[in-house]
């Protein structure tokens, strides 16, 4: 039921970046008479968080480009009172007031509200280890953090940096610091960068980072920091320390929910604020949006923390609608994201294979390496796609793509398909725009659908990377590589023998029909053709998902990660 709303109500918003600023503007568009007050602890409102690493790297050169609005411009357009450098220190739900401190003057006062929106965001995770307060250690979350790092670089001209953490901020900083000419090492406990990706797909990200000179120390635990020789030693468990001129902590973020906890709001996973689908908290007239709130994962239905700008903006709009008498509902987050990694683009949506299995879903995947556009048109680039679907229903669950062109377009199509509840088999039916410079007549998304349909119809049976070492080498199965003789000589999986696909029909007599045949080629296409030839001649055959290109990239990356001096990282 829609609530009745008061034209002259007073709305107080805590936090003036993505969710808070969106809510303020939406309320004004719906209600010209409401009094709207926003308190922002930093000195900036509505700033571009995602652009901060690019200012450090001189890609964005004008500081003013980081701020989408100023308090003055926001008031001029929306008549919203934006109070920067003001920290809300307490919420009093029974009195419907908040305690506020002016960080410039020290003045403290009480502000009343009819409706309250919490948009406090998240704070950088600070490990409880020695040395985190050193002057040469930095975090990056706000414009002030950015200016602090930028000023340090300009004044001291550091030649090396260690980044603790391999998520979005860590990778974007690594690229930008490398572009400034610095030696860069990423160190973290997990053995892969970018947790939204499966480890196999993350291998392509690792390779791109190494190609551009970023050293990776994966699977290493940071135990502390010490000053030495004008720089910082990064102390590692069971390893020699790393030495650098500066260190940036980018190990993740935690919900900023101290206010909510002290006010008695219900909290969820990792201390996040529990809200319903109207963005209402457990206390009447208090709403919460953005990185601090617990949401439902759209694919799994489980509680999740998804810190992304898109969901925060949508949530701010929904809270505003409901405050102004509407009945808007948040249907969940699916974690659609994209990142630039030097020349590569990596993108993901939905749930990856690893997390899908952890939630108890019985899933399968297809992996393919299509061209970004028609192969005969110059400039096409190979991308690697992994599509995750539920075995029993073929429900589309997620996708990951890495490549150098056309990645963002395909991930957005797949994200839309997930939101629409499509089955993976129906991807073949999508009517997508085609011209040789932009795509192929059978778009990569269509190709993924064709592959899943072949599985559903029994035309295609697959074997996967994790099966490679488990396949018997005792002659009980046939291990067949259908690439050219030259490709096979350049590298192949131990135990496989070579019959090029174009010679297969003439050489069927070399194979035993009583044995299952496990087939591989470079990308998966020729081996699929070989499987159809074999099946048509009475063989039981299985096609390798991803091809030797995929196998080689992943296994080489795993060897580098496990090496004693991870990827050649510098020692102290």
Predicted features and spans:
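Mid-to-C-terminal Rossmann-like scaffold of FAD/NAD(P)H-dependent oxidoreductases
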Residues: 4-9, 16, 292-404, 436-440, ...
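Glycine-rich dinucleotide-binding loop and its adjacent helix/turn
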Residues: 118-180, 215, 269, 275-277, ...
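A Rossmann-like FAD-binding core segment of flavoenzymes
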Residues: 33-35, 77, 83-104, 111, ...
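Rhodanese-like catalytic fold shared by cysteine-dependent sulfurtransferases
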Residues: 425-477, 485-516, 522-572
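Rossmann-like dinucleotide-binding cores of NAD(P)H-dependent redox enzymes
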Residues: 67, 160-161, 168-226, 306-312, ...
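N-terminal Rossmann-like dinucleotide/flavin-binding domain of flavoprotein oxidoreductases
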Residues: 26-115, 198-215, 220, 353-358, ...
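FAD-site-proximal beta/loop scaffold in flavoenzymes
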Residues: 133-157, 233-235, 241-318, 413, ...
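Beta1-alpha1 glycine-rich phosphate/pyrophosphate-binding loop at the start
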Residues: 5-85, 174-197, 336, 409-418, ...
